[in-house]
């Protein structure tokens, strides 16, 4: 094997190893792992979806890489395939979710808390929370400021 081939192989191993480790750390600091303990999606999700969304969870910001989904029973969360390591799809029953609107000077957001992982904060844009509310057949509502 030539030295160039060895360098390419080592680079690939290091790159994919670092990517794997980074995603595991991200799932830990965001709280995704904690949510997955109780809310990992058992099957394919049936409902409305918004793809390529940005959300904040814990100390992580999922920029245009999250999918939000809803039906009359659950909130569905997933990430794009390249980021799926350590991030199983989640289905969280609306009965376990509370949301509170927070207003700021220009844009507001809605902070979601989940019963079985109350330390995890999920921040959505108000428009995303409004979409969830409307497409959950108004089963879920957040507290407005």
Predicted regions and their residues:
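Anionic N-terminal interaction surfaces
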Residues: 2-72
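Cytosol-/stroma-facing membrane-proximal "stalk/adaptor" domains immediately downstream
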Residues: 98-145
């Amino acid at each position: 094997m030539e030295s160039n081939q060895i360098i390419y192989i080592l680079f690939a191993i290091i790159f994919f190893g670092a990517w794997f480790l980074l995603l595991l750390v991200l799932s830990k600091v965001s709280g995704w792992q904690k949510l997955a303990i109780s809310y990992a999606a058992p099957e394919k999700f049936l409902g409305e979806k918004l793809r390529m969304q940005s959300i904040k969870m814990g100390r992580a910001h999922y920029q245009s890489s999250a999918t939000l989904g809803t039906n009359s029973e659950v909130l569905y969360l997933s990430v794009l395939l390249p980021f799926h390591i350590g991030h199983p799809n989640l289905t969280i029953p609306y009965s376990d979710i509370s949301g509170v609107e927070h207003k700021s000077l220009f844009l507001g957001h809605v902070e979601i808390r989940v019963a079985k992982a109350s330390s995890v904060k999920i921040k959505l844009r108000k428009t995303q929370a409004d979409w969830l509310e409307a497409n959950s057949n108004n089963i879920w509502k957040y507290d407005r400021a």
